[in-house]
Amino acid sequence: MALDGGTGKVIVAPDASDVSELEARSRRRAELLADSAGEGATRDGHKVKLLANIGTAEDARKAAKFDLEGSGLFRTEFLFLDRDAAPSVEEQTETYIKVLQAFGQRRVVVRTLDAGADKPLSFADLGPEENPALGRRGLRLSMERVDLIDQQLEALAAAHQAVEGADLWVMAPMVSTIEETEWFAERARSYGLPQIGVMVETPAAAILSEQILTVADFASIGTNDLSQYTMAADRMQGELA
């Protein structure tokens, strides 16, 4: 029996020709992987960074072993979920240091706390909402619980200072207005953080992206939520997929 992991096919009682073809494809794949080091690019020469999505320091350690150019999304909410109190500045700093150390001088894009709606926090309950998905989630929660965002920015700044050569980028989730962008950018820059951005996850942010980028250094398109809010369709509801 032979299993072709590339196509998902199982060959029962493979003959010599089947085995020869599979071995040749396996060698070709190994050659391509061995020659895949360096910057990512399309066949016609356009550079495309290969960046990992991570949620923990362990994710960072595992991802950094591969020939990636860094992390394009560090979901920090996993530090905050399923606990009775927010992580301390010291605990957060320790985690961020581990992540930055894992990637060395490669880029790490950190998303600040993205909670609310489907990711509630017991220690940051702002009360019931009729429609949490359109309520105080993402940056809106941080703007009401300034203590949480300030502690996180302080920890990120401390980690950045502690890891020489770290390429840290920090962005806010669920931004919809210029005013929200200005609020976050001013606050983050006050901690000395070098690259400040926002997630484009709402139609409003997409429409205002040109103006937003006069304030923010970069923007990251959150395709899941942007598609969901644009199409008014819950991405978790199979009937609407």
Please identify what each model-predicted range represents.
Residues 29-241:
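Conserved alpha/beta-domain cores
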Residues 1-20:
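Conserved glycine-bearing catalytic or ligand-binding loops at nucleotide- and phosphate-handling centers
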